[in-house]
Amino acid sequence: MSGRPAAWLASSVMPPLGALRTAPAIARGHVRNTLAAWRLSELWDTVELVVSELAANGVNASAGPDGRPAFHNGRMPVIQVGLFTDGAVLVAEVWDQAGGVPVRKGPGDADESGRGLDIVHELTNARWGWHHAPAGPAKCVWAEFPISRASPTAFI
């Protein structure tokens, strides 16, 4: 992401969540509650789906070959979700502790998974990306959503 504002008008960061299959549902609830408080309900469905896909990717990336969380030094991996706005754009970030980079896979028609980043790409009009996190989690995947209206009381 380029050109982050010096200060966000509003932000909401969840506490770390265990990288479990339940994490995307909790992330969706956070998105819905935060956007309701910010009076941005027109973005609910899109942001909720994108964050859910990114959270699911973080959970999957944090799993071992058997699909269970890959504990490191006795600790469960975590993901974390943050929402930020400057009034013109909403940014959703999902951090995870998994190595590797997010890759659009281009699955076949018969594949049951692998479409998450394609969905994110389409719903954000390609306004998404990722970066390595300097401390703590291994990476952050972000997505931007333009805010279609300006409301001076939207973030109070």
Feature-to-residue mapping (PLM):
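Bergerat-fold GHKL ATPase/HATPase_c domain
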Residues: 1-49
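Conserved beta-strand-loop-beta-strand hairpin that lines the nucleotide-binding pocket
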Residues: 1-12, 59-156
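Short, well-ordered amphipathic alpha-helices
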Residues: 32, 58-59
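Short secondary-structure capping/turn micro-motifs that flank functional sites
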Residues: 51-52, 136
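Conserved polar catalytic motif of the HATPase_c/GHKL fold
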Residues: 53, 57
